[in-house]
């Protein structure tokens, strides 16, 4: 089995607008998505090498130093599949995709030569 890094993305601007939504409406929508996400995870639990976690604020390190940055990554996971296509197909219909302009990226993980 091959390993794949999965990143769940949503534009920062979309999330900022979502936070302005009526609190009762937002709570109901978030509870619905949590329930759908939990069901999806239970249905696909066999593909996860690491269910991952949410990610926070971003720092960028360059030759010039360290600075704050923003990106659209909300969460990450590690999954196992026979092929890249099979890994990607596993995420079709994922509840995360209900977020406007969201996406899920799946990248094959390769061992670094000579590294443990």
Kindly give the residue locations of the regions a language model identified.
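Conserved, structured core segments of small domains
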Residues: 1-116
């Amino acid at each position: 089995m091959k390993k794949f890094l999965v990143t769940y993305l949503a534009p920062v601007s979309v999330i900022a607008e979502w936070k302005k939504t009526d609190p009762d409406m937002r709570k109901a929508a978030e509870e619905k998505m949590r329930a759908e996400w939990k069901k999806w995870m239970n249905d696909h639990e066999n593909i996860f090498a690491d269910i991952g976690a949410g990610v926070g604020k971003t720092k960028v390190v360059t030759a010039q130093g360290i600075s704050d940055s923003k990106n659209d990554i909300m969460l990450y996971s590690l999954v196992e599949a026979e092929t890249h296509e099979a890994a990607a197909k596993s995420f079709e219909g994922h509840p995360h995709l209900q977020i406007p302009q969201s996406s899920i990226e799946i990248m094959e993980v390769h061992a670094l030569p000579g590294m443990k």
